[in-house]
Regions:
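Metal-cofactor-binding active-site regions of metalloenzymes
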Residues: 1-233
């Protein structure tokens, strides 16, 4: 299973961020790709540990989580700077024979875990927004994790509402959503009818990842036309 692979390689990647960046940059250059947006979760586990149901309004939560996020933002930026410096060293970017990956522009999308509680999703979303405000390398965020997990299915509409609030709070920070990564037999059929539409119309996603069940969406043709008008890619 795709999602089970991550834990199997977690140990092997520890301390190898610079190596991985160098490898993916070189591969991109070899394939004629000059710009990458890499999804990263640095700092997110620290943020969801701070979350919890509080009865506060979203505005009150934003203020509290933004304060908690401030030192994490500094840590993530420092880690990213160090990883990129290590990448440039491995690629020889300052030397006489730089490798092809030196020419590739790398930016980052923060990962927010959709299998967490709604409060944790909100907290991680605040961190993503604060990272984007503080560090221009962080250009947006995304939801990750199995879309057909019990928590992700049960909370899907609540998560879209939270993301919509964050979008209204900071409309210039892009959201790219994995949505419609569902199939018959793996998720209740009613969920195949609305996930992509709500990602677009409620959460304000500017890009959709996967979108595999698009044909099952209610009035799929109208949804496609809407996405074409808004230039929302899949």
């Amino acid at each position: 299973h795709f999602f089970s692979a991550f834990d199997k390689v977690r140990g092997a990647r520890q301390g190898r961020a610079a190596d991985m960046l160098a490898e993916v940059a070189n591969r991109a250059a070899d394939e004629g790709v000059s710009y990458l947006e890499l999804m990263v979760s640095t700092g997110m586990s620290q943020m969801h540990d701070q979350a919890g149901a509080s009865g506060e309004s979203h505005e009150q939560q934003w203020v509290r989580y933004a304060a908690l996020a401030a030192p994490i933002v500094e840590q993530v930026s420092a880690i990213t700077r160090a990883d990129e410096a290590g990448m440039r060293e491995k690629l020889g970017c300052a030397g006489p024979s730089p490798q092809p990956g030196c020419s590739v522009t790398i930016r980052y999308l923060s990962e927010v875990n959709r299998t967490r509680s709604v409060d944790e999703v909100f907290a991680q979303g605040v961190l993503a927004h604060r990272l984007g405000a503080a560090d221009p390398r962080f250009v947006g965020f995304n939801l990750v994790g199995p879309e057909d997990s019990p928590r992700a299915l049960a909370d899907y509409r609540a998560q879209m509402t939270v993301l919509a609030w964050l979008h209204r709070r900071n409309p210039d920070f892009p959201l790219a959503l994995h949505a419609g990564e569902l199939a018959e037999g793996l998720a209740p059929p009613e969920h195949l009818l609305f996930h992509i539409r709500e990602a677009v119309q409620v959460a304000g996603a500017r890009r959709i990842g996967h979108g595999a069940d698009l044909a099952y969406e209610r009035d799929a043709q109208a949804l496609l036309q809407l996405m074409a008008r808004k230039q929302i890619a899949v």
